From Swiss-Prot:
CDD domains attached to this UniProt entry: RecA
Molecular function terms from GO: ATP binding; ATP hydrolysis activity; ATP-dependent DNA damage sensor activity; damaged DNA binding; single-stranded DNA binding
DNA-binding is among the record's keywords: yes
Name recorded for this polypeptide: Protein RecA
InterPro entries per UniProt: AAA+_ATPase, DNA_recomb/repair_RecA, DNA_recomb/repair_RecA_CS, P-loop_NTPase, RecA-like_C, RecA-like_N, RecA_ATP-bd, RecA_C_sf
Length: 363
């Protein structure tokens, strides 16, 4: 039996009718909700590139694919205790302040160390800080600051410390399941629109908990339910890899950050860098590591060299040389930035997505 062939017939009259109907609908929407409430994406003003703020880590900026964390988005930074979550958030605040941005810190944990923040480059005189009593109060303050349109970066530290009022007023040991998850879900529904309109970056720091009875897959989960996983444009998993020592004295941690979710660039890239006690992210350490990956810094045995000039024997000596010679460090950084694509490819080579990554990143 012969199959009948389908023939597409162009009907210019139908196309004109559709165009008129769309124009009428657009005009009606703009009258009802205001000009700019709906538009054609490719027409009118030029589509803006994603605005970003540096994380303070050159390697992480490259791994994020757009040169930093995107503005007007929700960001989640999570990981085990003492892995560098707050340090990374404070570095982002410091970078925003360098550009003249106004920043706020909602300290739900009541644990911010102003001395350490100042060492990381944070201008405490211009930093707005709040230490709320309840989760509802913290999120109301967050909503008010975001709606003001004057805040560039706002950090909430942490989701786990956003205790609902009902839990605080109740007795110790009372079972009230789902309170925090419902609180976060409602808050994010309200916040997401104003965050986009005000172009404010909101960073939620989160903690890790263990799921009971998990036989297969990772038993780890983050607090506050699933809403934050869905609303976050970028999710960063930060882990301590090792402790750095000078002889027997601990001087810092080597940490690994994995981009678990990224809505503005390819995800699953990971990068390692040093966080030194009392200093924060070691920029000179990153220049050496990224320079070696990009072929800019040569490594021969234990010796590091750049442009036929020896930097030092051993990584710590090379870091000390760059610290004492900022002009050479600046030239290496400029060369790395010129080869960001190559460095990003090298970073991606080391990141093999797992089933857990796809589960978390799909949110």
């Amino acid at each position: 039996m012969a199959q009948s062939s389908l023939r597409l017939v162009e009907n210019p009259t139908m196309d004109k009718d559709k165009s008129k109907a769309i124009d009428a609908a657009l005009a009606q929407i703009e009258r009802a909700f205001g000009k700019g409430s709906i538009m054609r994406l490719g027409k009118g003003d030029k589509v803006q590139e994603v605005e970003t703020i540096s994380t303070g880590s050159l390697g992480l900026d490259i791994a994020l694919g757009v040169g930093g964390l995107p503005r007007g988005r929700v960001i989640e930074i999570y990981g085990p205790e003492s892995s560098g979550k707050t340090t990374l958030a404070l570095h982002t605040i410091a970078e925003a302040q360098k550009k003249g941005g106004v920043c706020a810190f909602v300290d739900a944990e009541h644990a911010l160390d102003p001395v350490y923040a100042r060492k990381l480059g944070v201008n405490l005189d211009d930093l707005l800080i709040s230490q709320p009593d309840t989760g509802e109060q913290a999120l109301e303050i967050t909503d008010t600051l975001v709606r003001s349109g004057a805040i560039d970066v706002l950090v909430v530290d942490s989701v786990a410390a956003l205790t609902p009022r009902a839990e605080i007023e109740g007795e110790m040991g009372d079972q009230q399941p789902g309170l925090q998850a419902r609180l976060m879900s409602q808050a994010l529904r309200k916040l997401t629109g104003s965050i986009s309109r005000s172009n404010c970056m909101v960073i939620f720091i989160n903690q890790i908990r263990m799921k009971i009875g998990v036989m297969y897959g990772s038993p780890e989960t983050t607090t506050g339910g699933n809403a934050l996983k869905f609303y976050a444009s970028v999710r960063l998993d930060i882990r301590r890899v090792s402790t750095l020592k000078d002889r027997d004295e601990p001087i810092g941690n080597s940490v690994r950050v994995k981009v678990v979710k990224n809505k503005v660039a390819p995800p699953f890239k990971q990068v390692e860098f040093d966080i030194m006690f009392g200093e924060g992210v070691s920029k000179v350490g990153e220049l050496i590591d990224l320079g070696v990956k990009a072929g800019i810094v040569e490594k021969s045995g234990a010796w590091f060299s750049y442009d036929s000039q020896r930097l030092g024997q051993g990584r710590e000596n090379a870091k000390g040389f760059l610290r004492d010679n900022p002009d050479i460090a600046g030239r290496i950084e400029a060369a790395i930035r010129q080869n960001m694509g190559l460095v990003a490819d090298k970073i991606l080579e080391n990141a093999v997505p797992t089933a857990e990554d796809y589960d978390e990143g799909a949110a």
